[in-house]
């Protein structure tokens, strides 16, 4: 009886963790999605948005060669997984009054994939 219960518990736990790898973020898919972002976020000095190379772990409004909005300057964020996720999903909710003219990306998996891609930018 105890062996049977332990076996069932092991199978249940194994099933729970079987899909974990399948849910991992996909940087290559994130790169495909980033094409829309690249319309503004480029390495050109006259770009509409700031350069996102090295954005992961960087403080918000940290690039000296980009003119950030006052709300972004006051945001005092560090671009980690949580802050990037919130901002990509709904920029105005995360930093009210920022200038990014983007409504947000609603699919959570797509957001995670974009973040995985941003982590590759150095």
What are these regions (language model features)?
Residues 25-67, 73-78, 89-98, 120-122:
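Periplasmic/extracellular electron-transfer cofactor-ligation site
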Residues 1-11:
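Bacterial N-terminal signal peptides that target proteins for export
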Residues 103-107, 113-120:
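Short, exposed beta-strand-loop hairpins at the edges of beta-sheets
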Residues 19-20, 25:
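N-terminal signal peptide c-region/cleavage motif recognized by signal peptidases
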Residues 27, 81, 107-108:
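Alpha-helix N-capping/helix-start residues
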């Amino acid at each position: 009886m105890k062996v049977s219960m332990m076996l069932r518990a092991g199978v249940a736990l194994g099933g729970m963790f079987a899909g974990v790898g399948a849910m991992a973020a996909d940087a290559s898919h994130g790169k495909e999605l980033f094409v829309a972002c690249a319309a503004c976020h480029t390495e050109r000095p006259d770009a509409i948005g700031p350069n996102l190379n090295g954005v992961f772990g960087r403080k918000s409004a940290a690039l000296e060669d980009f003119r950030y909005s006052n709300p972004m300057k006051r945001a005092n964020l560090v671009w980690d997984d949580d802050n990037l996720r919130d901002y990509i999903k709904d920029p105005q909710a995360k930093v009210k009054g920022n200038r990014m003219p983007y409504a947000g990306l609603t699919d959570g998996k797509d957001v995670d994939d974009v973040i995985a891609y941003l982590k590759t930018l150095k």
